[in-house]
Amino acid sequence: MDYKTSGVDIEAGREFVSEIKQAVEGTHTSNVIEGIGGFGGLFRIPIDSFKKPVLVSGTDGVGTKLELAQSKNFHFEVGIDLVAMCINDIITSGAKPLFFLDYIATGKLDKKQLLRVVQGISHGCGENNCSLLGGETAEMPGFYSKNKYDLAGFCVGIVDEDKLINGKKVSENDLIIALKSNGVHSNGFSLVRKIIQNNNQIEKEFEKVSHLSFYDELLKPTKIYNNVIGQILSEDIEIKAMSHITGGGIPENLPRCIPSDFIPYINTNSWEIPILFEFLKKIGSIPEKDFWNTFNLGVGFCLIIDKQFKDRIYNICKDHDIDSWEIGKIVRKDNATISKFLPEILT
């Protein structure tokens, strides 16, 4: 028995690398020293632009959104999701992304399918001046089923140590600015999938109340906030802290970016929760606490700032076609009049 008979096609793997080469190398900046194919990606760190350069790294996946995306042929979109989940994490430190690595594991290499994934990854990287420096595609018969794949991403960025954003400057009455999400992004899909399994008319029901395609809305790629954040920082606007709203929603992610003696007080009436979330809540009978602790509810990213910068940030976000608004403020934990992060039912 040869290797191909056992389920691993080496030649197909070589052909796949050849087919993705154009998309991958299209993301390369002048700091990439060699193209794909080596044992390690080589990247020249632009240290001349920094006094005390600090590398910031992040790794993530797309979770069980992949299950639905694969069944509906949203392969390009999950490639973008993979990049977004990593870049959105590292930019919370004020970092600029430098390069990205991907890992794709599958039961059987479907070149057409995975080419779309890599094209999505390349698109996400290219739009954010982030080089797709390398990756691994593993064909693993018997471990993954024939038509399934899993994704993991790894991103490295850079920031000057003196410009690190770590929440230490957060103070009482700072404003919390929300940046709108594209939708569900890449979290909560284990719950979403169970709701879909229990409601075989869910597409028709959603289209009836929204006049929108259910899966087009549900599987929109995660918004990448790098370009808008980069412009804000380039205009000498001080951001004291940032939070990427992912699994755990606002209640779990926002407190992570501020000192422990403060809490974020959120005005839950400051925005209208998008119809997709309200629909899922109703049709899935999701309890209020789970609703807030699972989904982003229309808020993909948060900034904590001094009030003097609010209008300038709104204008920059508008230039990037991103809705933004004041969602709350920072208060001390010992504040006797405001003792809850969110309404009591949520805490």
Curated annotation (Swiss-Prot):
Gene Ontology terms describing biological process: 'de novo' IMP biosynthetic process; adenine biosynthetic process
Pathway recorded for this protein: Purine metabolism; IMP biosynthesis via de novo pathway; 5-amino-1-(5-phospho-D-ribosyl)imidazole from N(2)-formyl-N(1)-(5-phospho-D-ribosyl)glycinamide: step 2/2
Subcellular location as annotated: Cytoplasm
Origin superkingdom: Bacteria
EC numbers: 6.3.3.1
Keywords from the UniProt entry: ATP-binding, Cytoplasm, Ligase, Nucleotide-binding, Purine biosynthesis
Keyword ATP-binding: yes
Gene Ontology CC terms, in alphabetical order: cytosol
UniProt signal peptide: none
Catalytic reaction equation(s): 2-formamido-N(1)-(5-O-phospho-beta-D-ribosyl)acetamidine + ATP = 5-amino-1-(5-phospho-beta-D-ribosyl)imidazole + ADP + phosphate + H(+)
Gene Ontology MF: a single term: ATP binding
Short name of any one Pfam family annotated for the protein: AIRS
Annotated protein name in UniProt: Phosphoribosylformylglycinamidine cyclo-ligase
Organism in which the protein naturally occurs: Prochlorococcus marinus (strain MIT 9215)
Originating gene: purM
